[in-house]
């Protein structure tokens, strides 16, 4: 992951995505976009973890409903890696409020705005600092994996020099 353009970000498929059977469809979107899943698991987020994750919202009127929502049923947490992964995933997720999310975005297609409740199916880290903090909340280093994808070949063929190309091929030689 030496390339500065290659980033890792945390994604949470929230309880509404899980109970509505949307996990496969949403995960597929990230894979089709060329992002690499380097860690993934299903967990039931407890209150303590939820409060750590959403600490910056403590004291805001939506904090308690948010904690209740994220702890209501299991979630799928995953780390994806790719070129500009943080901004790519945020764009794919769409606006936080589903009524403001563009059609074609994950929240635009699957999010629900029900009265004063928002079910927006997905969380995506909003910055490199948030991504690092959030990944460390949910994953141990040994739960994140390095491996080659077919798309890696494409990126390696665009090396600027033969040396750069050969140095980058270690992933493909395993």
UniProtKB/Swiss-Prot annotation:
Q: Where does the sequence pass through the membrane?
A: none
**EC number(s) recorded for this UniProt protein:** 2.7.4.6
Q: Which residues form the active site?
A: 123
Q: Which UniProt keywords apply?
A: ATP-binding, Cytoplasm, Kinase, Magnesium, Metal-binding, Nucleotide metabolism, Nucleotide-binding, Phosphoprotein, Transferase
Q: What is its main location?
A: cytoplasm
Q: Where in the cell is it found?
A: Cytoplasm
* Keyword Iron recorded: no
Question: SMART domains of this UniProt entry?
Answer: NDK
Q: Which reaction does it catalyse?
A: a 2'-deoxyribonucleoside 5'-diphosphate + ATP = a 2'-deoxyribonucleoside 5'-triphosphate + ADP; a ribonucleoside 5'-diphosphate + ATP = a ribonucleoside 5'-triphosphate + ADP
**InterPro entries given for it?**
NDK-like_dom, NDK-like_dom_sf, Nucleoside_diP_kinase, Nucleoside_diP_kinase_AS
Q: Name one GO biological process term.
A: CTP biosynthetic process
Q: Which domain of life is it from?
A: Archaea
Q: Which Pfam families match?
A: NDK
Which amino acid positions bind ATP, per UniProt?
Answer: 14, 62, 90, 96, 107
Q: Which cofactor does it need?
A: Mg(2+)
- Gene Ontology cellular component terms for the protein in this record: cytoplasm
Task: State one molecular function term (GO).
Answer: metal ion binding
The UniProt entry, under HAMAP family, shows:
NDP_kinase (MF_00451)
Please give the function described in this protein's UniProt entry.
Major role in the synthesis of nucleoside triphosphates other than ATP. The ATP gamma phosphate is transferred to the NDP beta phosphate via a ping-pong mechanism, using a phosphorylated active-site intermediate.
Q: Fetch the NCBIfam families from UniProt.
A: PRK00668.1 (NF001908)
Q: Which family does it belong to?
A: Belongs to the NDK family.
Official protein name in the record: Nucleoside diphosphate kinase
Organism, scientific name:
Thermococcus kodakarensis (strain ATCC BAA-918 / JCM 12380 / KOD1)
């Amino acid at each position: 992951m030496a390339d500065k353009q290659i980033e890792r970000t945390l994604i949470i498929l929230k309880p509404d995505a899980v109970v509505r059977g949307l996990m496969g469809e949403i995960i597929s979107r990230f894979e089709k976009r060329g992002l690499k899943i380097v860690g993934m698991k299903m967990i039931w987020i407890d209150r303590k973890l939820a409060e750590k994750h959403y600490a910056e919202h403590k004291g805001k009127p939506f904090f308690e409903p948010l904690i209740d929502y994220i702890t209501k049923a299991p979630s799928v947490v995953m780390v994806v890696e790719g070129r500009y992964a943080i901004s790519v995933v945020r764009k794919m997720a769409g606006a936080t409020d589903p009524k403001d999310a563009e059609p074609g975005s994950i929240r635009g297609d699957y999010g629900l705005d029900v009265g004063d409740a928002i079910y927006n199916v997905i969380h995506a880290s909003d910055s490199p600092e948030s991504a690092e903090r959030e990944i460390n909340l949910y994953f141990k280093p040994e739960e994140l994996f390095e491996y080659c994808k077919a798309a890696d070949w494409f990126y390696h063929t665009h090396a600027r020099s033969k040396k750069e190309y050969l140095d980058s091929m270690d992933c493909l030689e395993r």
